[in-house]
């Protein structure tokens, strides 16, 4: 089998994770920490790309990586327009939306830009894979009870789809042939209904929908939320933080550290026990609801993300959902590996690269 060498780039707010892979095998994985003062010199996140590019090239050189031997560069997908899942070739339309922050400004927007800037000089392809804006929801799943307020698909697409493919391999099937319920449990929690390779419904794990998590409130009583918003006691930003960042375990027990909470549970703390069980209860409830989306025809339930390392949490969830389908646990997440595998599927011609095309306010994927 021929070897494809792939450079993978995953930019964060103050760091850039890079990896070099020979097919699926990691040759180099490193987290480049950026000086906060250096980052602070740039007014816009997008202005950092040249600085980060040079830093990446310096690190590769220091490890003896000959970039002329690369076959492709793959970056973390940013805040683009809603698109279906898959591996996309970085093109001019995508670069424009990333640079202009069409759906928001975030460090992940640099992923596609950095991939393109490095790849174009080497005359090799640049890709992104399954960005957070992946949207494959069916029309019926978008409807809410208020006109003009559609449900949105915002979830851990990269890890959910990567783990779903691994489980499909373990079951000796193609991802596109299975119905899976995949639950990513980290700072936020999302439960995706994967129908034959498409995530046809998923809770919005960012903006207050689904189970509460270490840092996010999830679904809350809306009437009480409205009363709180108009009580005159809180600014808008404070309310947003109650939903994202200071919600969930942070609000209920004062920490986002699930390990600490689990230690409290093991010591018999009644409040911690109730709250931790409540989080598992809400995850199980979301899984149960998602099973109805797939008419109860489920090949497997998958638990992944950092919280899937918690035996207490996993056992509580299993106890409530094992009757629906077998529960498979893949703890943690490996975004660099997932990005490399997405690029590799295209290089091996196992799937065609998709094209990001903007037409009259909408984006279509062609591939």
From Swiss-Prot:
UniProt KW Repressor keyword: no
The principal location of this protein is cytoplasm
Q: Please list the GO terms describing molecular function.
A: acetate kinase activity; ATP binding; butyrate kinase activity
Recite the lineage of the species: Bacteria, Bacillati, Bacillota, Bacilli, Bacillales
Q: Which HAMAP family match?
A: Butyrate_kinase
Q: Does the keyword Nucleotide-binding apply?
A: yes
Identify the species of origin.
Bacillus mycoides (strain KBAB4)
The record ties this protein, via PANTHER family, to:
ACETATE KINASE, BUTYRATE KINASE 2-RELATED
Which Gene Ontology terms of cellular component type are present? cytoplasm
The domain of life for this entry's organism is: Bacteria
**Compartments it resides in:** Cytoplasm
What is the name of this protein?
Probable butyrate kinase
The protein's matches in Pfam families, at most eight in alphabetical order, are given as:
Acetate_kinase
Q: Which InterPro entries match?
A: Aliphatic_acid_kin_short-chain (IPR000890), Aliphatic_acid_kinase_CS (IPR023865), ATPase_NBD (IPR043129), Butyrate_kin (IPR011245)
Q: Which family is it part of?
A: Belongs to the acetokinase family.
How would you classify this enzyme at the top EC level?
A: transferase
Give the EC number(s) under which this enzyme is classified. Answer: 2.7.2.7
Give any single GO term for biological process: acetate metabolic process
Q: Which reaction does it catalyse?
A: butanoate + ATP = butanoyl phosphate + ADP
Alphabetically list the UniProt keywords.
ATP-binding, Cytoplasm, Kinase, Nucleotide-binding, Transferase
